[in-house]
């Protein structure tokens, strides 16, 4: 049996059980795309196609993939929602962090905006949308996605806190979070004007000395909008080694804990790294149509979920299992990388057990792997 067929068999039973469709080929070809992504560690269609165990020309295999990516009968959210329902079935008492961020693909033609769930000091995809062009995005572009996520998540978790960077600093984002019943922690620019409860108004960076933490309660944000919020401020070191202010607005009490919570947002940047050079090379996709990118992300998301699931499996087996793929005496690989390397070693050597995909994750909290001191905020 080919290694690709091994992976197919381990994905097949659970995905067909969760996503029943009349046309079985929709799921069959979906699984082959997932297999190709895992095998090739790439989102390039020719490389995905090269991993499919079919005695056909390369062009035919790529055509099969393209047809699935363009198939309007493949409903991305209904397919993926069924999987997420299974993944989150035991999370009803959990307060979760959702992380909103964007990444450019195909140069600057497309932006993928993704809501991800913090898991094991990384993040797994929950929902995404593709927007043409670059630059800051307005709240109306992503509102329907966030409302969809809210309707889904409220059935499976206790409370949601949304973390976002300064690309989402407009007051509209914070206001939408409150409408959705979510807490929020959003980074703002250091030159933002705030008005204190006593009526004093000035730029935020004029209030906070370098390398000092400050916490402001019940301030009004910006000169125009006057959003009432709380602000937590700390400092980190930028790429040039200079002090850089980190200011976070939140509906909760401004305090040190808010800064620690926001540090969780780094998980999504590292997870996009898993999608790109550290894993599946998403940035180099040459797809030019939003629908095809949307479908590709459906395959990539299942690949990511399985890697997280395998990472959990390895940690549950103990240090002896981790040391088979992680050469350090302490963990230096993310949950995603542990899972991906275990999968690759199984396919290469056949020496270790590879469990079937179960679409099951625990509310795992892990300490981060080693991070250079220069990247750590003063929290």
Regions found by a protein language model. Give the residues of each.
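Short, positively charged, Gly/Tyr-enriched micro-motifs
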Residues: 24-72
């Amino acid at each position: 049996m080919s290694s690709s067929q091994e992976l197919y068999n381990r994905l097949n039973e659970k995905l067909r059980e969760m996503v029943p469709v009349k046309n079985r080929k929709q799921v069959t070809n979906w699984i082959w795309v997932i297999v190709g992504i895992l095998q090739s560690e790439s989102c390039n269609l020719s490389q995905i196609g090269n991993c499919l165990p079919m005695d056909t020309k390369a062009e035919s295999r790529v055509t099969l993939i393209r047809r699935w990516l363009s198939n309007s009968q493949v409903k991305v959210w209904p397919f993926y929602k069924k999987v997420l329902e299974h993944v989150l079935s035991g999370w009803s008492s959990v307060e979760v962090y959702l992380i909103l961020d964007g990444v450019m693909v195909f140069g600057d033609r497309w932006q993928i905006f993704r809501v991800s769930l913090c898991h094991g000091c990384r993040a797994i995809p929950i929902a995404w949308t593709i927007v043409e062009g670059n630059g800051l995005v307005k709240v109306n572009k992503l509102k329907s996605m966030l409302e969809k996520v809210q309707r889904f998540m409220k059935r499976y978790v206790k409370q949601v806190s949304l973390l976002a960077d300064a690309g989402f600093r407009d007051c509209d984002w914070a206001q939408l979070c409150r409408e959705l019943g979510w807490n929020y922690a959003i980074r703002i620019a250091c030159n933002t004007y705030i008005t204190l409860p006593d009526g004093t108004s000035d730029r935020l960076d004029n209030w906070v000395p370098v390398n000092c933490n400050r916490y402001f309660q019940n301030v009004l944000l910006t000169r125009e909008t006057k959003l009432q919020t709380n602000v937590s401020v700390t400092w980190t070191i930028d790429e040039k080694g200079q002090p850089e202010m980190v200011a976070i607005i939140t509906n909760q009490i401004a305090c040190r804990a808010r800064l620690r919570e926001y540090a969780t947002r780094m998980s999504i940047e590292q997870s996009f790294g898993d999608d790109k050079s550290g894993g599946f090379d998403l940035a180099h996709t040459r797809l030019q149509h939003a629908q095809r990118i949307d479908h590709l992300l459906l395959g990539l998301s299942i690949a990511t979920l399985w890697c997280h699931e395998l990472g959990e499996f390895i940690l549950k087996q103990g240090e002896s299992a981790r040391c088979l793929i992680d050469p350090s005496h302490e963990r230096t690989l993310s949950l995603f990388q542990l899972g991906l390397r275990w999968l690759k070693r199984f396919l290469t050597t056949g020496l270790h057990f590879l469990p079937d995909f179960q679409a099951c994750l625990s509310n795992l909290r892990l300490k981060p792997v080693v991070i250079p001191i220069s990247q750590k905020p003063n929290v």
